[in-house]
From Swiss-Prot:
Protein name: Pyridoxal 5'-phosphate synthase subunit PdxT
Membrane spanning stretches: none
Listed InterPro entries: Class_I_gatase-like (IPR029062), PdxT/SNO (IPR002161), PdxT/SNO_CS (IPR021196)
Species, as recorded: Clostridium kluyveri (strain ATCC 8527 / DSM 555 / NBRC 12016 / NCIMB 10680 / K1)
An MF annotation (GO) of this entry: pyridoxal 5'-phosphate synthase (glutamine hydrolysing) activity
Subunit structure: In the presence of PdxS, forms a dodecamer of heterodimers. Only shows activity in the heterodimer.
EC numbers on record: 4.3.3.6, 3.5.1.2
Length: 188
């Protein structure tokens, strides 16, 4: 199984290590041609405005959007979630628009407000999962067909719609492989 990781910035290496530890083949994605021959793609954290601009500058935005809409399993973490969202609060800019959610950027504050949390997410694991939030967004609107997987303090921080998984937090920054296992199971 070949799993693409959008490789502009963010936790690229950490996602690659988790993919390798699950015996899948990671593929760094830096242009639209590398979107071929992958079984799924991860859009990591980073800075969503920069990543969105790079998707446009490399002519990847529309080809990636088309592949996702045709069923390519896709997971967006933090900034990746923002890129996938239909809309972003207090912004007239959105990017891939493939999941019916509205997100609030930096919803938990600045870098200094980053935090760690553990919780049970039954769809993902039977054990508590460590969650790392860094300048994290959360979902402020969830479309009727989008399933909430996890909420913290009343805010949705993980959701799924068909082939698309989104998380506000960074599973790649922990040793826990639960979310990566779950995502890979959708790529088969």
């Amino acid at each position: 199984m070949r799993i693409g990781v959008l490789s502009f910035q963010g936790g690229v290496i950490e996602h690659i290590h988790h993919i390798e530890s699950l015996k899948a083949i990671p593929v760094e994605i830096k242009n639209k041609y590398e979107l071929n021959n992958i079984d799924g793609i991860i859009l990591p954290g980073g800075e969503s405005t920069t990543m969105g601009k790079l998707l446009m500058d490399t002519d990847m935005l529309e080809p990636l959007r088309e592949k996702i809409l045709k069923g390519l399993p896709t997971w967006g973490t933090c900034a990746g979630m923002i890129l996938l969202a239909n809309s972003i609060e207090n912004s007239n800019k959105s990017y891939l628009k493939v999941i019916d959610i509205k997100v609030r950027r930096n919803a938990y504050g600045s870098q200094i407000d980053s935090f760690y949390y553990e919780t049970l997410i039954p769809d993902i694991s039977s054990s508590k999962i460590p969650l790392v939030f860094i300048r994290a967004p959360f979902i402020t609107y969830l479309g009727s067909n989008v399933k909430s997987l996890c909420s913290i303090k009343g805010n949705v921080v993980a959701a799924r719609y068909k082939n698309i998984l989104v998380t506000s937090f960074h599973p790649e920054l922990t040793d826990d492989l639960s979310f990566h296992k779950y995502f890979l199971s959708t790529c088969r």
